[in-house]
From Swiss-Prot:
Notes concerning its domains: The N-terminal domain of NC, but not its zinc finger, is required for nucleoprotein complex formation and its chaperone activities.
UniProt xrefs under Pfam families: Ty3_capsid
This protein's encoding gene: TY3A-G
Superkingdom classification of source: Eukaryota
Record carries keyword Cell membrane: no
MF terms in GO: DNA binding; zinc ion binding
Zn finger spans (CCHC-type): 265-282
Annotated site residue numbers, Cleavage: 207-208, 233-234
Subcellular location: Cytoplasm
SUPFAM superfamilies the record matches: Retrovirus zinc finger-like domains (SSF57756)
Keywords: Acetylation, Cytoplasm, Metal-binding, Transposable element, Zinc, Zinc-finger
Misc remark: Retrotransposons are mobile genetic entities that are able to replicate via an RNA intermediate and a reverse transcription step. In contrast to retroviruses, retrotransposons are non-infectious, lack an envelope and remain intracellular. Ty3 retrotransposons belong to the gypsy-like elements (metaviridae).
Main location: cytoplasm
Protein name per UniProt: Transposon Ty3-G Gag polyprotein
Organism expressing this protein natively: Saccharomyces cerevisiae (strain ATCC 204508 / S288c)
Length: 290
């Protein structure tokens, strides 16, 4: 199998002279697909340019090949077609990057982003899933669109009343701090399954189901007319999940409640004092085993 046949992404790629193919390092984690990840394109190009600045390149063709090896379909197929049309030995790297940007970059739709955010709530998802999905959607927001204070307000509207009050008490200064405080002050049972309790072995007893929001990767209705001002007045979602069944014979309710853990400064995971959840050795050991 030739070197060019090993390039991922499919499609035929023009042959290059051997001197155009130095032993440059490939980073599997640095990729751009060109499908539902337009918001990642600027960072992708920046990281590619940073990596390339540390390597001596014989010509533009080798730089194009390096960038191309970090593309997945459909971006990879576009690169193949674009280079075929321009000619691999004639096209410049700047022209290639400019073409990639113009073809795949789409300005973020603020209304769609806010519409997706308003579908989230701690009551429906638990704090773990809420944080995961909020981060994924928030990454699509333009970097300077909101102040940190506005970002914190947007996030805390999704929390339950109890969690909201605790986060507010800590007075977080950044969105990251607010999300961490919400995670730390919510009991383990509430993170994945809101309202559920733990049995004697610490396993979650699934006594109810929740309706989860579909991933934001799918396209939204073009008739969506949610405005930013309308979103500001959106009322936070209240708990709407089904209450778990209470007739489990083997259930033990001797675990400290969330309020007791907070009051007595106990770890939410092992129920012992002297450390917070992110410092819990038992939790880290459990994560390593899984």
């Amino acid at each position: 199998m030739s070197f060019m046949d090993q390039i991922p992404g499919g499609g035929n790629y023009p042959k290059l002279p051997v001197e155009c193919l130095p032993n440059f390092p490939i980073q599997p984690s640095l990729t751009f697909r060109g499908r539902n990840d337009s918001h990642k394109l600027k960072n992708f190009i920046s990281e590619i340019m940073l990596n390339m600045s540390m390597i001596s390149w014989p010509n533009d063709a080798s730089r194009i090949v390096y960038c191309r090896r970090h593309l997945l379909n459909p971006a990879a197929q576009w690169a193949n077609d674009f280079v075929q049309e321009q000619g691999i030995l004639e096209i410049t790297f700047d022209t290639f990057i400019q073409g990639l940007y113009q073809h795949f970059y789409k300005p973020p739709d603020i209304n769609k982003i806010f519409n997706a955010i308003t579908q989230l709530s701690e009551a429906k998802l638990g704090i773990e899933r809420l944080n995961q999905r909020f981060r994924k959607i928030w990454d699509r927001m333009p970097p300077d669109f909101m102040t940190e204070k506005a970002a914190i307000m947007t996030y805390t509207r999704l929390l339950t009343k109890e969690t909201y009050n605790i986060v507010r008490m800590h007075k977080p200064e950044t969105l990251k701090d607010a999300m961490e405080e919400a995670y730390q002050t919510t009991a383990l049972t509430e993170r994945f399954f809101p309202g559920f309790e733990l049995d004697a072995d610490g396993d979650t007893i699934i006594g109810a189901t929740t309706h989860l929001q579909e991933e934001y990767d799918s396209d939204y209705d073009s008739e969506d007319n949610l405005t930013q001002n309308g979103y500001v007045h959106t009322v936070r979602t209240r708990r709407s999940y089904n209450k778990p069944m209470s007739n489990h014979r083997n259930r033990r309710n001797n675990n400290p409640s969330r309020e007791e853990c907070i009051k007595n400064r106990l770890c939410f995971y092992c129920k012992k004092e002297g450390h917070r959840l992110n410092e819990c050795r038992a939790r880290k050991a459990s994560s390593n085993r899984s």
